[in-house]
Amino acid sequence: MHTEKDPNKNTPEQQTPISLNDQMQRRLEERQQLMEAGVNPYPTHFEVTHSSGEIIANFVEEAKTPVSVAGRIMTIRKMGKASFFHLQDSAGRIQIYMKKDEVGDATYDTFKLLDIGDIIGIKGFTFKTRTGEISVHAESLELLTKSLRPIPVAKEKEVDGEKVVFDAFSDKELRYRQRYVDLIVNPEVKETFIKRSAIVSFMRNAFTGKGWLEVETPILQPIYGGAAARPFTTHHNALDMQLYLRIANELYLKRLIVGGFDGVFEFAKDFRNEGIDRFHNPEFTQVELYVAYKDYNWMMEMVEELFSQTALAVNKSEVTTFLGNEISLKPPFRRLSIIDAITEYTGQNIAGQSEEQLRYTAKDLGLELDPKISSGKIIDEIFGEFVEPKLIQPTFIIDYPTEMSPLAKEHPSQPGIVERFELIIGGKEVCNSFSELNDPVIQRERLESQAKLRQRGDEEAMIVDEDFLRAIEYGMPPCAGIGIGIDRLVMILTGQDSIREVIFFPHLKPE
């Protein structure tokens, strides 16, 4: 037996020859019959003592352990005066066996008005069937929620003499729009999000275990900064002022380092008013961390340890498969300067090239450029087009030109280069980190240069933030900072090929 997608069975409306309206009408009639029989289809509570997983894990032969379990009916097999059915809860599925003679006529009459998708509570005892399946022998049944809309169910057909199970709910866009149905019928989807939660929990515990403080900073900001991106704009009516949804947390977290905290971090929703594809969502999650008295070399070692330990914690292995590639997260990761990386993968040595020379190099490589962009942006375009997709194993790309990194500290022995790295895994950026610039005079010069780039038409150039400059004028200690994209890290550790598979409710075009 194998499973495949049935092209004619993608939506709930197409699951049976009966129309959706007819099915819902029948369920509405059943709801009414239940109410007329004195059964409340939506009671307030039910006492649960065990999950399905606990029942199976703790099963003892012949013990007949009393249990109370609740969940959604996913299969029903009625055999005259007895029935088997499966309940699904957050931990999995458990089979229920029920006999009319034992639960009584009234309860069995209620059961006959139930459908796949209804949520019920069962009290009974554990046993194992003759086929060896751990089950619950029902002594009572209580309806907890009458489902009015039928859920999709897998369909088995015979194709060329072989039994084939067609997916119940496999259309990707429909899955993303109706994630609640996706979670019901596709258990592997739920596992992805459980693993996502475990990844975030492990990282949070790792940070707090080192004494760093978890904080919260503003989402609505009067000046956006900390990244090169276009913001979402809104308006505060009471203050009659324009505000922006944050594109990064960086400048506020640095203010807290100025204020005396040695390490701060924030798991945050950030927003960038840019394109949507399988690696980008306009609303995304990242964690930013800033640690005083450290630099980017220390941060690289911290990231190697963090990613390795996170993989071991959630996958029991430092090896994962992403976009068809086997990737090892075992330290140490390769380190390569951005200039050397471009030379290695394009054959072009761009060290010391002027803006005009960079444009010629890009043209030789077949890259069409916006005439408004500057040298740093040209290098970024060359790297993104010809180098980044080829970096499959974890690679720190280090030592960027100053213009590309206005918030990073200059390298002490390489003029025009800053102490910055990006971590590339599977051809995608996962982290961005600096030794943070803390000289307020140079920081002002850098931001004013960014303002000139905005005047040239670079919408992603940073804005001069006078309050941030005032903060670091009080003195910010040497500091290393990093932003880690949680969505992409989850993709890598769960083997998903789209960011929409790791976000519960991704942004989609209107229906």
UniProtKB/Swiss-Prot annotation:
Residue ranges with Polar residues bias: 9-21
GO molecular function: ATP binding; lysine-tRNA ligase activity; magnesium ion binding; tRNA binding
UniProt-annotated binding residues for Mg(2+) 1: E422, E429
CDD domains named in the record: LysRS_core, LysRS_N
Stretches the record annotates as Disordered: 1-21
Annotated SUPFAM superfamilies: Class II aaRS and biotin synthetases (SSF55681), Nucleic acid-binding proteins (SSF50249)
Compartment annotation: Cytoplasm
A Pfam family it matches: tRNA_anti-codon
Swiss-Prot/TrEMBL cofactor(s): Mg(2+)
Enzyme class: ligase
Listed GO biological process terms: lysyl-tRNA aminoacylation
Entries under HAMAP family matching the protein: Lys_tRNA_synth_class2 (MF_00252)
Stated name of the protein: Lysine--tRNA ligase
Organism, scientific name: Pelodictyon phaeoclathratiforme (strain DSM 5477 / BU-1)
Organism classification: Bacteria, Pseudomonadati, Chlorobiota, Chlorobiia, Chlorobiales
